[in-house]
């Protein structure tokens, strides 16, 4: 009987765990929807900013303008901005982006370049601190759905490092959202800004929907028709000054989009991990129930045999 009680307790424990994992899956799904809405809400601003930058570039294309954020210089030190999460229970999300950052650091070292880390997320921060890697700044405790203010704070740190000459290039290592079951850690250059890519407005958005009782993601390619600025538009300030002021804003916007995509990847990974955990819990409950029924049947059979044996002994 003691064995039966232990199995019952184990079944109860697994069922309680399943309730937790299922709740976490639903919470992650709700936050993915919120992240989707936030991405869509920032698109009009991003499109208008791209329009203004494209117009200013066209006005200044034949002028010799000194814009530090566009200048490429000899690279000696690279800042690696690594975007990870603060929490676990999200499959291989954190380990994959950390592995990609380590790989990029080795590539830079092989080229004879120094590197510094700027870390977003507690998991990557703890990992690189334990290995005594050069960390310039760490950001943790961010909202699960990143805000513009958080992106601005990180962008200010990167601008300070780049403009002061502490680093000559800033690279971003983050997880690109592909689907609920697939993501890809990628590396892209943030600074210096690419003048050819300032007006790029093509984008992909994702929509979390339900189909057949399960969650699925629909991707949509958006192409914004950015109209050129009127040729007779008069700027009160010098166009070069306006462009110089807007470039940091463009950097913050690009960083915000990357943070949002990384957050969507983390939430999707957590959804997948919790869904797998719930499925495993269901399977384990089934196995334990089968073991319990067999043990209970064996106990009943044993009791019947004992009763029969006792009756035969009395009759004999």
UniProtKB/Swiss-Prot annotation:
InterPro entries named among the record's database cross-references = ATP_synth_F1_ATPase_gsu, ATP_synth_F1_gsu, ATP_synth_F1_gsu_CS
Q: Which organism is it from?
A: Synechococcus elongatus (strain ATCC 33912 / PCC 7942 / FACHB-805) (Anacystis nidulans R2)
Main location per the UniProt record: membrane
HAMAP family, sorted: ATP_synth_gamma_bact (MF_00815)
Subcellular location(s) of the protein: Cellular thylakoid membrane
**Pfam families cross-referenced by the UniProt entry:** ATP-synt
Q: How does it assemble?
A: F-type ATPases have 2 components, CF(1) - the catalytic core - and CF(0) - the membrane proton channel. CF(1) has five subunits: alpha(3), beta(3), gamma(1), delta(1), epsilon(1). CF(0) has three main subunits: a, b and c.
Keyword annotations for this protein, in alphabetical order, are: ATP synthesis, CF(1), Hydrogen ion transport, Ion transport, Membrane, Thylakoid, Transport
How is it placed in the membrane, per its record? Peripheral membrane protein
Name the UniProt record assigns to this protein: ATP synthase gamma chain
Q: Which gene encodes it?
A: atpG
């Amino acid at each position: 009987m003691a064995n039966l009680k232990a199995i019952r307790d184990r079944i109860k424990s697994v069922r309680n765990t399943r309730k937790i994992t299922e709740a976490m899956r639903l919470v992650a799904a709700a936050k993915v929807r919120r992240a989707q809405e936030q991405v869509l809400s920032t698109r009009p601003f991003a499109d208008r900013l791209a329009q203004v930058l494209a117009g200013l570039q066209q006005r200044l294309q034949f002028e010799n303008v000194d814009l530090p954020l566009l200048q490429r210089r000899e690279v000696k030190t690279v800042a690696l901005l690594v975007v990870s999460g603060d929490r676990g229970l999200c499959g291989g999300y954190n380990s994959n982006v950390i592995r990609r950052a380590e790989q990029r650091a080795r590539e830079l070292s092989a080229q004879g370049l120094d590197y510094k880390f700027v870390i977003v997320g507690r998991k990557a921060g703890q990992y690189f601190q334990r290995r005594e890697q050069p960390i310039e700044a760490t950001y943790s405790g961010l909202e699960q759905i990143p805000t513009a203010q958080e992106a601005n704070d990180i962008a200010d740190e990167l601008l300070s490092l780049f403009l002061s000459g502490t680093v000559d290039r800033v690279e971003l290592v983050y997880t690109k959202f592909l689907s609920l079951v697939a993501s890809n850690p990628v590396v892209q250059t943030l600074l210096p800004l690419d003048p050819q890519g300032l007006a790029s407005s093509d984008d992909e958005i994702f929509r979390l929907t339900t189909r057949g009782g399960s969650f699925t993601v629909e991707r949509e390619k958006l192409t914004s028709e950015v109209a050129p600025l009127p040729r007779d538009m008069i700027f009160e300030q010098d166009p070069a000054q306006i462009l110089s002021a807007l470039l940091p804003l463009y950097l913050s916007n690009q960083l915000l989009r990357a943070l949002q995509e990384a957050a969507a990847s983390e939430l999707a990974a957590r959804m997948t991990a919790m869904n797998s955990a719930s499925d495993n819990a269901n399977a384990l409950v089934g196995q334990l129930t089968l073991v319990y029924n067999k043990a209970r049947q064996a106990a009943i059979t044993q009791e019947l045999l004992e009763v029969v044996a006792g009756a035969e002994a009395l009759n004999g």
